Amino acid sequence: MATALTSAEVFVALVVAAHAAVLALRLSISLYEA
C-alpha cells in the first residue's frame, strides 16, 4: 500500500477499529455469561 493517509483518515480508522473491538468484546462477554 503506497497510499499516503492523512492524519484525519488515520484517526477515523482508529476510532472505527476501537468501536469494533469494544462491540466484539461486549458481545463475547455477554455470550460467555449467558
Swiss-Prot record:
One family name in Pfam for this protein: PsaM
Record GO cellular component, one term: plasma membrane-derived thylakoid membrane
Main location: membrane
Key words of the record: Membrane, Photosynthesis, Photosystem I, Thylakoid, Transmembrane, Transmembrane helix
Organism superkingdom: Bacteria
Membrane disposition: Single-pass membrane protein
This protein's record includes keyword Membrane: yes
Transmembrane segments: 10-32
Compartmental location: Cellular thylakoid membrane
Example GO biological process: photosynthesis
Protein family membership: Belongs to the PsaM family.
Protein name: Photosystem I reaction center subunit XII
Source species: Parasynechococcus marenigrum (strain WH8102)
